[in-house]
Amino acid sequence: MSKILTFVKNKIIDLIKNDQIKYSRVITIEESDSLLSVNEVYANHGFDCVEMIDENIINENLEQYKTDSFLQ
C-alpha cells in the first residue's frame, strides 16, 4: 500500500512540475459580490466560469441572446 501511495504522490508532483496540471483560483461568491455590480453571482467551482444572472431582464429582451445551437 505504501508503494502505491508513493507512486501516486510522485506522479502528481511530476505532473505539477511539468505544467500538465494548472492551478486556477476560484473566486468565492462573497468576493464576486464585492467586485461585480450584479444582483446574483453563481460560481461553478472547479471550472473557470461565472454565470451572472440579472433577474430584472424581461423575457422579450432574451430573444437577442438566443442562437440556433443554444436554447432550442
Swiss-Prot record:
Up-regulation conditions: Expressed in the early phase of the viral replicative cycle.
Keyword vocabulary terms for this entry: Early protein
Which Pfam family, giving just one, matches this sequence?
A: Orthopox_F6
Q: Which family does it belong to?
A: Belongs to the orthopoxvirus OPG050 family.
Q: What is this protein called?
A: Protein OPG050
